[in-house]
């Protein structure tokens, strides 16, 4: 059956695959017949992701992408890829007056530096095919809107969006596309562990035109579109997935 949105048989590396959007993206890609390389820092949670994936031939590699040695090992152990989903991320609620060099370095390293270096080393080692697709997880925060306490997170994600545009230009002659997804608030287990109460979360959802947060699979579907040949003329873009929040 003709399906330009198919990713069947594509080899795709997903980082941050042990939870949240990364986990869901890996599972959804496997349902569509892709062959996954999944990575994350927590072996037990990564193993759970692997157990929920469909099909066979998937590879699990435990790695801490804030460590250059782990990045190099991951690249060496990866097969030649059709796609990369740079999804690993970190947030810390803090306002400007409480920023420290150490706190800023930590969040920038995880959200910005590590995914950039992973991409760069995959390119250098010729581990991405011509016609390949790279998707970075960015955010509406910092790019389209801001929020109290998001100063470091917004900065790191705005930097990712800037990198995506420049890298797309650099890679165009090689036939490699570079895009980003920019989600609004998404229902993940991170919210289960937050200090924000249910009533506060319900009130916050009312700020969204659709009166709810997004689901991880709704972001995964956007990522799959950008990985597929249906987006073959799309590069340097940020796909906003926010239930209309930034329209207000």
Task: Describe the residue ranges of each PLM region.
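Short C-terminal tail/terminal secondary-structure segment
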Residues: 2-3, 224, 235-248
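Residue(s) in the substrate-gating loop at a strand-loop-helix junction
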Residues: 139
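Active-site helix of classical SDR
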Residues: 119, 156, 164
